[in-house]
Amino acid sequence: FWAAYLIFIGVMLSFAFEDIFPSMEPYHIMNQGLIYLLILDFLLRFMLQPAMSQEIKPYLLMPIKKNKLVDTLLLQSGISSYNFFWFFLIVPFALLTIIRFYGFTGILCYLCGIWLLMAMNSYWYLICKTLLNEKLLYILLPIGVYGLLAGTEFIPEGNPVSTFMMNLGEGFIEGNILSFLGVIAAILLLLLVNLSLIHISEPTRHSLIS
C-alpha cells in the first residue's frame, strides 16, 4: 500500500513541480525539499524501525561477545532495507525528471546519494534513540538541532539550508565526488559517536542489551 502511494506521489510531484515552478527543473525543487524528507524519515523511524534492544535479543544466547554483536548491528543499520524505503518515491520521480538530462547514470548516482543520506539519518536516529533510553531529557537534542536548522532556513534571506540541499542533490546527480565524500564523512562521524555512546556509557549498554 505504502509503496503504491509513494510511487503515485513521486509521479505527481514531477508534473506538479514543473507546472508550479516553470523557471526551475523539478529535481531542483525536490532537492530543496530533501531536508524535510530527512526530518519526516527521522520521525517515522521511531514508529517503524525496531530498537537495537529488540534486534539483539535473538542473538543473546549465541556465543558472541555483546560488544561485537552491537558493532555488527550498528554497521548493518547502514545497509538496512528501511534506508531504501523512500526509493518508491524517488525512483519514479527521477525517471521522469532526471533521465532526460543526465541519463541512467545520473539516476544511479542520485539514488546512491539518497541512500547515503538515509544511512546518515539512520545513525543520527540511533544516537537520539540511545540517549533517550538513558534520559527523556535528551529529547531536547533533536528538538534543538531541528530548531537550529529551521532558524537557519527561515531567518536569513536566501533559505541557506534548502539551497545547500539543492546543490548537494545536484552534486549527486552529476557524480560530484565531493558531495559523496561529505556525506560519507558525516556517516563515519555519526557511527563513531554511536560506538562511543554504547561502549563508554554503561547505562546505555544495559538499555541496549537487556
Give, region by region, the residue ranges found by the protein language model.
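Hydrophobic alpha-helical transmembrane segments of membrane proteins
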Residues: 1-56, 66-205, 210
